[in-house]
């Protein structure tokens, strides 16, 4: 976040890669040893914070060009995140489970825009920071579609 906010996009890209490496390792360690509720909670909480901080960094780096697209992107992340978590909570209450996305600490509802796609978009944003507004708006549209898909899936499944 800080590197991106300061306009050091390549350093931001390095930190982004390190963050994703750490995120992947913590999940692998949990699956190889013991998965805990605390670990699952921290994993999802830090992921959603991370997803909001990257666009915020771009908004701070160039408010005139990036602030509105960053706000729209963050709003779209609220949609994907809230529909994802609302489904997981309700599925848990109803005793539903799946391992379609691998072994997870909660019901993992797939979507058009997931972690891999988000990271790919963030990589493009860091590599081509002048494209941020267009990339943010395109990705936000895809996230809003994902939100709609998840709401529909929740409505028809639960």
Residue locations for each model-derived region?
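Membrane-embedded alpha-helical segments that form the functional core of polytopic membrane enzymes
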Residues: 1-38, 131-143
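Membrane-interface alpha-helices at helix entry/exit sites of multi-pass transporters
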Residues: 40-43
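A feature for the membrane-embedded catalytic helix bundles of lipid/isoprenoid biosynthetic enzymes
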Residues: 45-158
